[in-house]
Design a protein with these regions (language model features):
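Ser/Thr/Pro/Gly-rich, low-complexity intrinsically disordered stalk/linker tracts of secreted
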Residues: 61-63, 102, 119, 139-140
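Conserved structural position at the C-terminal beta-strand
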Residues: 108-112
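Signal that preferentially marks extracellular ectodomain short beta-strand elements
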Residues: 70-105
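Extended, polar beta-sheet/loop recognition surfaces of beta-rich domains
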Residues: 18-21, 30-32, 36-38, 113-152
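Sec-dependent bacterial lipoprotein signal peptides
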Residues: 1-17
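N-terminal export/targeting and maturation segments
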Residues: 16-76
Length: 152
């Protein structure tokens, strides 16, 4: 009986797990986000003059949808965006564009639709303000977070 319950639970988890990740196309400077609920781009250093961006959906949508956020184009109206700065202690609602400072490290967080979806990835900007993935740090953090999760 114990094995039947374990098998049923594994089957349920395999069928209910959805793809919640997000990707950055460095060439196009576009984020592709699967099943978005909340998305944020914030500087790693809280004393930096860079802005933090929090993205929320204005209207509910189907779960199986991919949202796109262009870093070099105008922000679409389907997102409610809050731009804030810890350096100047001010915020703006619905800015037109995303302004990333050159030579700055960023943390991008995705809270997806589903239970306990909270993904963090690390990026940096080059001297021209283009965002790039910090692959060595992302791999290190992902392996450690898996180990921590398995040890609980």
């Amino acid at each position: 009986m114990k094995y039947i319950i374990t098998f049923a639970m594994c089957l349920f988890l395999m069928c209910s797990c959805d793809y919640h990740d997000f990707e950055l196309s460095e060439k196009e400077q576009v984020f592709y986000i699967n099943q978005m609920l909340h998305f944020s781009i914030e500087p790693w250093d809280s004393l930096s003059k860079a802005y933090t961006y929090d993205f929320f959906l204005r209207t509910p949508k189907p779960c199986k949808e991919v949202d796109t956020i262009y870093l070099e184009r105008k922000i679409p109206n389907k997102f409610e965006v809050i731009e804030s700065s810890s350096y100047t202690r001010e915020y703006n609602r619905d800015p037109s564009f995303i302004k990333l400072l050159p030579n700055t490290q960023y943390i991008v967080a995705h809270t997806g639709i589903g239970a306990r979806v909270n993904i963090f990835k690390y990026y940096y900007t080059d001297p021209f303000g283009k965002l790039h993935a910090n692959d060595s740090l992302n791999e290190h953090i992902n392996v450690d977070s898996i180990r921590i999760h398995l040890n609980r």
